[in-house]
A protein has these predicted regions:
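Short N-terminal helix-initiation segments at or just after the protein's N-terminus
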Residues: 34-50, 114-124, 176-187
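Aromatic/basic-lined ligand-recognition segments
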Residues: 60, 66-80, 156-164, 173-187
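Oligomerization/assembly interface segments of phage tail-like spikes and tubes
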Residues: 92-110, 165-183
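Acidic, Ser/Thr- and Gly-enriched intrinsically disordered low-complexity segments
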Residues: 42-46, 97-99, 103-105, 110-139
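Acidic-leaning, charged glycine-interspersed low-complexity segments
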Residues: 119-178
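Hydrophobic/aromatic-lined pockets within catalytic cores
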Residues: 21, 25, 135, 181
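Small/polar-rich, solvent-exposed N-terminal microdomains that initiate assembly or binding
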Residues: 1-91
């Protein structure tokens, strides 16, 4: 998998997420993979539904991106939450807004090359990186940060996200905020 995975020919929110991906990739060299918006897929295991985050990799294939999915290293991805609001008046640009989350998971040893658990320093570095985002025709802000597994991966089946993947040396965050875009398009 490439370090920065973007959707081909992105529009609307995917295009805006691409700007944030660029800032993350440029400013957080410890991120092995800077991924686009994830899709929530469902599979049945032992008669029960299990929900997982996945990214589309082409040719009708998806790659699961939970911490235990495979050895993908430190990574980030986006979740576009609902509802998406549309503001449109005839003769003007379309404005859309939506809550969103940036999920970041990492092995803290690869960030500082030490056996320390300074999660506040990691949060600071991530906030500094996304603050450097230049976004054409849009803006975003972060309102909340979550650290507990049940909040970071709340849309997904908790059994699949064992808490061991948030114990030393691993940690994760959910940066939740609001994103607004403007687009020239016909409705």
């Amino acid at each position: 998998m490439e370090r920065v995975v973007k959707k081909a020919n992105p529009t609307l929110f995917d295009k805006a997420f691409g700007y944030i991906q660029d800032a993350l990739a440029t400013n957080l060299l410890w991120l092995n993979h800077v991924l686009p918006q994830a899709e929530r897929l469902v599979k049945e295991i032992n008669g029960r539904k299990v929900y997982t985050p996945n990214i589309y990799v082409g040719e009708n294939e998806y790659e699961q991106i939970l911490p235990d999915a495979q050895d993908i290293g430190n990574y980030s991805f986006f979740i576009l939450e609902e509802p998406q609001e549309v503001h449109y008046e005839v003769g003007s640009r379309v404005k859309m807004s939506s809550p969103f989350s940036l999920i970041v998971w990492l092995d803290i040893r690869s960030v500082y090359n030490e056996d320390l658990r300074d999660m506040e320093m990691v949060k600071r570095d991530i906030l500094r990186a996304i603050r450097r985002t230049w976004m054409r025709n849009g803006h975003f802000h972060i309102e909340r940060i979550y650290q507990r597994a049940e909040n970071i991966f709340k849309e997904f089946t908790m059994d699949e996200v064992d808490n061991q993947f948030l114990m030393q040396p691993y940690c994760g965050f959910r940066f939740r905020g609001e994103i607004e875009i403007e687009e020239e398009c016909e409705l």
